[in-house]
């Protein structure tokens, strides 16, 4: 809201990973006057929200402006719920390494788009959503924060590397 008050004209809000989640949240809860100035919200492989946030009037007002980009084996971007459609991007890396946007393939002026996520992403999506649905909001927040911290601390790019580096 502070930035929007200081910037004239149309706004674009964006972020990657947890920043993508924050961008969507900020756009959803900034108030109608600022929402009317927002042209687009770009979420690059950021997690979604629980059903309470998805049903909020502010989220519903901004939902049509949200564009969420995920790589074909997305894990982070598939966490929690999204009402907007995913735009699937081809990554030149595997599994968790695909979260790095520098691995996303660009063809001239746009990403290399794919029609669907792969089977591993669908499996992780189904499994994690079923598991997270049983948690309290506080537990979900702790879980997502813990995943980010483990990935950061271990410099892991795959589950195998995460396991190898767990006690290092």
Describe each PLM feature range.
Residues 23-32:
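Short glycine-enriched nucleophile-adjacent loop
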Residues 14-19, 23:
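Gly/Ala-rich beta-loop-alpha elbow adjacent to hydrolase catalytic centers
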Residues 1-11, 31-168:
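Alpha/beta hydrolase fold serine-hydrolase catalytic domain that processes acyl esters and thioesters
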